Amino acid sequence: MAETLQTGKPIDFSIMPSFYCNLRCWFCMYDCSPENRRVLDYKKTKVFISKFDWKLINAFGFYGGEPSIFTHSYEPFVCLIPDEIPRFVITNGTWSVSEDYTELFLNWCAKHRFHIIVSSTPDHIKYQNRVFLENLAKELDGALELKNPDEIHAQGRAKGHDGVISDCKLTCQRTDRNIRLGLKPDGNIVFQNCHGEYHVVQTYEDEFSGIIERTNQIVGKCYKQKIEKNEKR
């Protein structure tokens, strides 16, 4: 999970404009790949975003899919977000092996004042120029962050994979993180604080108003079921 600077606002919201990716990681929770070209409906997203109460938004993220190979499709969605809202982008870092892609991607990130978060599992690192990224992180001094290696959870393609344990660590109950919500290309909005299942909270055709209450209701029901299940063991 990406860590964001806490400002007292309760929601970190993200948009996944596409699941198109130049990698096919065995553990991808969103089943991203070079063949997955499904994209988010811009008009419906624009209507939904126009109803946001921006006082509730701590930070706004973009990922998917790999943003660096599809910036022209991400661009219209980025432009929907008010300039004063902190933004971050999560990338697999493959752009670092090409001078041309590096320049294009970093210029795009600078244009939108993105905090850049680079995935750092062994499966990502082998497709990166890691030394370059480490030096760049020092040079940009906080603007680019190399993630700690993610713990692989039983979601997406990792579900049922040998060595991946399906468990619940009740991370939904942590008080040091905001509510994390992500809009997927199919229009579903999922709760992303969980290490197990990403519950669908609503769609982008529903109202933004009440999204926190709906999230808390779904999470509370799941938490109660987990506690009751543990007590029966």
Each predicted region: which residue ranges?
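Catalytic cores of phosphodiester-bond-cleaving enzymes
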Residues: 1, 31, 204-206
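Conserved glycine-rich "GG(E/T)P / GGGxP" loop and the immediately following alpha-helix
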Residues: 12-18, 23-150
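N-terminal [4Fe-4S]-dependent radical SAM core
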Residues: 1-14, 54, 168-170, 178
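Accessory C-terminal segments flanking Radical SAM cores
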Residues: 157-233
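Short, compositionally biased leader-like segments
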Residues: 143-163
